[in-house]
C-alpha cells in the first residue's frame, strides 16, 4: 500500500510523497524491476521511473492511472463551483510547494521518456481517470506501451477483474 493508505502509516499522500516512497523502496530493497500501480500510484510510478535508471527489462503495469492531474483539478473546481481566482491561487500553491506547475504531474508527459515495457489497463467508463486523458497517449503509438482497454469495469472493478489479472500475469511471464 501507499503511504497513508490501507495498513500503511502516515496521514498524508500526494504524488511526490508516493514517488519518493517508490525511490526509497527501490534504493533500500531493490532493485525493483516490476511494478503494478493503480490510480495515483500510476502517476507516482511514472514520476519515479522518470528519475530512475531503468531499461526495457523493467515492466510497469498502470491500472487506471491518474493520467492528467489537471483533469482531476478541473473536476474538483467544477464540482465545488469555485471561480478562476481560487483556481489560480491553487495552481500557484502547487507550484510553490512542489516546484512544478500542475500540468507537470502527468503520466502522458512522462510516457515518451519511459524505457520500460508498460501494460496500461484502462476502462472506457472510468469516471475518476477518464479515457479521454489516455487517448492522446494511445494515438502516439509508443512501441513500449501496450494498452488493454476494457468497458464497464470503471475505476475500481478493473483491478479485480479476472481477465485483467490474467493479462497482467501474461505480461509478467518470462
Place the predicted regions along the sequence by residue.
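Conserved alpha/beta-hydrolase
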Residues: 1-9
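Alpha/beta-hydrolase active-site loop
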Residues: 10-33
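Gly/Ala-rich beta-loop-alpha elbow adjacent to hydrolase catalytic centers
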Residues: 36-45
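Hydrolase active-site cap/lid region
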Residues: 52-98
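Short beta-strand/loop motif that positions the catalytic acidic residue
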Residues: 113-115, 120-122, 126
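Short alpha-helix in the alpha/beta-hydrolase fold that links the catalytic acid
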Residues: 116, 130-139
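Acidic catalytic loop of the alpha/beta-hydrolase fold
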Residues: 124-129, 156
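Catalytic histidine-centered segment of alpha/beta-hydrolase-like enzymes
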Residues: 153-163
Amino acid at each position: 500500500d501507499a503511504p497513508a493508505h490501507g495498513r500503511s502509516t502516515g496521514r498524508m499522500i500526494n504524488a511526490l510523497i508516493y514517488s519518493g516512497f517508490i525511490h526509497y523502496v527501490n534504493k533500500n530493497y531493490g532493485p525493483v524491476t516490476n511494478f503494478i500501480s493503480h490510480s495515483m500510484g500510476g502517476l507516482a510510478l511514472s514520476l519515479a521511473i522518470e528519475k530512475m535508471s531503468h531499461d526495457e527489462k523493467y515492466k510497469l503495469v498502470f491500472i487506471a492511472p491518474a493520467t492528467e492531474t489537471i483533469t482531476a483539478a478541473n473536476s474538483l473546481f467544477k464540482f465545488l463551483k469555485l471561480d478562476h481566482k481560487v483556481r489560480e491561487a491553487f495552481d500557484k500553491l502547487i507550484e510553490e510547494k512542489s516546484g512544478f506547475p500542475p500540468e507537470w504531474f502527468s503520466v502522458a508527459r512522462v510516457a515518451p521518456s519511459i524505457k520500460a515495457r508498460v501494460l496500461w489497463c484502462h476502462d472506457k467508463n472510468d469516471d475518476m481517470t477518464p479515457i479521454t486523458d489516455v487517448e492522446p497517449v494511445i494515438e502516439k503509438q509508443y512501441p513500449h506501451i501496450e494498452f488493454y482497454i476494457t468497458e464497464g469495469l470503471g475505476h475500481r472493478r478493473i483491478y479485480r477483474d479476472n481477465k485483467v489479472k490474467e493479462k497482467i500475469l501474461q505480461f509478467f511471464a518470462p
